[in-house]
Regions:
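C-type cytochrome heme-c attachment and multiheme electron-transfer modules
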Residues: 1-194
Length: 194
């Protein structure tokens, strides 16, 4: 396969990027949990170490029909879906998630009870994830009680083309062996979520 210019001229990104959105839970401001790649620590803190990351290479079809290997960031999203009255799968509305998770602007007591691992009556981002059947069943039961049929978690991964942070000269990839060897960039792994 031919390679896009960006493949050699964007060998690494020197900033964090979204890795995943977790809409199976809500933060207190009704947002999903977000995870970033390319940073050690909280991306909102100036003390976190930015490490950057190497984008994954995927096939891209240009408008002229040419297929090229090009750099992408992969973003994984997790979310609740349910079956509507016609049997069609639909995403659970934010309003319904808010109803399941909150009472009077705070986490509902049954949510705190099942998610609060350290028993301090608050939920940290590390606790606020569905990592047990008890947590999943609690949220599922609350969504079912709202009239949603067969609520369950799904996920999808979307590729986002990288066309910025172009380098030139000695910072671009100038060695064919970077891709043409047993540890090729083409077959490198990229973590999809935490």
């Amino acid at each position: 396969a031919a390679v896009a210019c960006e493949t050699c001229h964007i060998p690494q990104l020197y900033a964090p990027a979204i890795q995943s959105y977790d809409w199976t839970v809500l933060t207190l401001n009704s947002q999903p949990l977000k995870a970033c790649r390319g940073i050690n620590g909280d991306p909102t803190k100036t003390t976190s170490l930015v490490t950057g990351y190497k984008p994954v290479l995927l096939n891209r079809t240009n408008i002229d029909g040419n297929k090229l290997l090009a750099p992408y960031n992969l973003i994984t999203s997790y979310y609740w879906v349910y079956d509507d009255a016609n049997g069609n799968k639909r995403p659970v509305r934010l309003f319904d998630l808010q109803t399941a998770f909150f009472e009077n602007g705070k986490y509902a007591a049954d949510i705190v009870s099942v998610f609060d691992a350290n028993h301090d009556d608050t939920l940290s981002n590390t606790e606020l994830k569905i990592d047990s059947s008890a947590k999943e069943e609690t949220v599922k039961a609350k969504l079912t009680s709202l009239g949603l049929n067969n609520p369950h978690i799904e996920g999808s991964t979307q590729p986002y083309s990288i066309n910025h942070n172009v380098t030139r000269g000695e910072n671009a990839i100038n060695d064919c062996q970077v891709c043409h060897n047993e540890n090729s960039r083409i077959s490198q792994s990229l973590k999809l979520s935490e």
